[in-house]
UniProtKB/Swiss-Prot annotation:
InterPro entries: Flag_Lring (IPR000527). The keyword Signal applies. Its main location: membrane. Belongs to the FlgH family. It comes from the Bacteria. Assembles around the rod to form the L-ring and probably protects the motor/basal body from shearing forces during rotation. GO terms for biological process: bacterial-type flagellum-dependent cell motility. This is Flagellar L-ring protein 2. PANTHER family: FLAGELLAR L-RING PROTEIN (PTHR34933:SF3). It comes from Chromobacterium violaceum (strain ATCC 12472 / DSM 30191 / JCM 1249 / CCUG 213 / NBRC 12614 / NCIMB 9131 / NCTC 9757 / MK). A lipid is attached at residue 18 (S-diacylglycerol cysteine).
């Protein structure tokens, strides 16, 4: 009895160890350090100095690696799916024996008595299925991201991560994508709807996640018995 209990406990531990977390949706670094500035040119006595040049009418827009901007996440998703299936199958078989037949290992009287015998069989199968699925999701938040690369056409590759911990629950938001500098407002803000190749991920770790998600043992039974 003790050996069976030990085997059961070891099997449970092995199954728990087999639980693999899904890879993160946002790949790559979520921040970038600004590139080092070139060594300043020595003063040559002129009024204009190339090392300290700053355009007077240049907008303070994120155009270099290491610059930051704010992404306003406004994602609304709504899907509806309906499916109905009806299958019907009917089969039939009919045969007649009009004369006596000769069957080995049967008495002649029984074989001759089969004359005039008819065989009839029929079968039918019906299958009807119907399913409806509706999903509505709303995700509203904001995150400040860093420019990690500047493409040849001037578009900005951005990525960022924000983590907020309240008591024992930790919420993390990760975002990556490509932003057109023309879509950035004067206050360095852009909507997530204008981010190309957007990868937005939100995860919560803590007691809330433990209560909302089924345990690993329940997942095993649900995969084996989905009904």
């Amino acid at each position: 009895m003790k050996s069976k209990l030990a085997i059961t406990m070891v099997s449970a531990l092995l199954l728990a160890a087999c639980a693999v977390q899904e890879p993160p949706l946002v790949q790559g670094p979520t921040t970038a350090k600004p590139q080092p500035r070139p060594v300043g040119l020595p003063a040559n006595g002129a009024i204009f100095q190339a090392a300290s040049y700053r355009p007077m009418f240049q907008d303070a827009m994120p155009i270099q690696v290491g610059d930051t901007l704010q992404i306003t996440i406004q994602e609304n998703s709504s899907t509806s799916q309906s499916e109905q299936v009806t299958d019907t199958r009917t089969s039939g078989l009919s045969s007649n024996i009009t004369a006596g037949v000769k069957i080995p290992f049967l008495p002649s009287g029984l074989a001759s008595g089969l004359g005039g015998t008819s065989f009839n069989s029929s079968g039918s199968a019906n299958n009807t299925g119907k399913g409806n699925n509706q999903v509505a999701t709303t995700f509203v938040s904001s995150i400040t991201v860093t420019v990690t690369d500047v493409l040849a056409n001037g578009n900005l590759v951005v990525s960022g991560e924000k983590m907020v911990r309240i008591n024992s629950d930790t919420e993390s938001i990760r975002l990556s994508g490509v932003v057109n500098p023309r879509d950035v407002t004067p206050d360095r803000t852009v909507s997530s709807l204008k981010v190309a190749d957007a990868r937005i991920e939100q995860q919560t770790k803590g007691n809330n996640r433990l209560y909302n998600e089924p345990g690993w043992l329940s997942k095993i039974f649900m995969s084996l018995l989905p009904i």
